[in-house]
């Protein structure tokens, strides 16, 4: 078994106490190009080095948590990674995340502290990870991968 290295937003990566856990897990912090282009480039370099060593790297090609639980359009970062290192890509999807403690709250910036808490909308959410066959990294595009992930989730095309 090989551990998976997750690419994650640097502000989450840098949460006190959690940072130690993320560093120990060898997570890769990333920022948007407008926010911190140097950190973004370092993240792409670290992803490339990890893939060159045969490590598994997990990215969320949308670039952020969605506000409504639906898939947002995939960004081109996956294509940038594959242009440097065309490794096989295993499309994966999470089902039933919306309403769990990991979803955003629609009113997170307004209302009381209770409104802003990440209290699950349903108890014991049954989250599923579904996996498709690998896609050749030399031919994979953000559009193709997004379509595969949508199909895994059962989203209409």
How would you name each of these model-derived features?
Residues 28-53:
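Helix-adjacent hinge/juxtasegments
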Residues 14, 40-44, 74-75, 113-114:
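Amphipathic coiled-coil/heptad-repeat helices and related helical stalk/stem segments
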Residues 1-37:
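Catalytic core of membrane glycerolipid acyltransferases/transacylases, capturing the structured
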Residues 9, 62, 94-97:
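Cofactor-binding loop segments of dinucleotide-utilizing enzymes, especially the Rossmann-like FAD-
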Residues 67-140:
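A cross-family acyltransferase "interaction/gating" segment
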Residues 48-79:
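Catalytic-site beta-strand/loop segments enriched in glycine and acidic/polar residues
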Residues 21, 49, 80-84:
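Hydrophobic/aromatic ligand-binding patch that stacks against planar heteroaromatic rings
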């Amino acid at each position: 078994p090989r551990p998976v290295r997750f690419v994650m937003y640097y502000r989450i990566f840098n949460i006190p106490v959690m940072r130690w856990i993320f560093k120990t897990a060898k997570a890769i912090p990333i920022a948007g190009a407008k926010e911190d282009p140097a950190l973004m480039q370092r993240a792409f370099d670290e992803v490339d080095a990890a893939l060159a060593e045969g490590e598994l790297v997990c990215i969320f090609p949308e670039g952020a948590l969605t506000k409504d639980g639906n898939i947002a359009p995939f960004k081109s970062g996956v294509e940038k990674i594959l242009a440097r290192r065309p490794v096989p890509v295993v499309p994966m999807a999470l089902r039933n995340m919306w309403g769990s403690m990991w979803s955003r709250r629609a009113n997170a910036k307004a209302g009381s502290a209770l409104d802003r808490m990440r209290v699950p909308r349903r108890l014991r959410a049954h989250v599923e990870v579904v996996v498709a066959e690998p896609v050749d990294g030399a031919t994979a595009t953000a559009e193709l991968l997004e379509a595969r992930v949508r199909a895994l989730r059962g989203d209409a095309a």
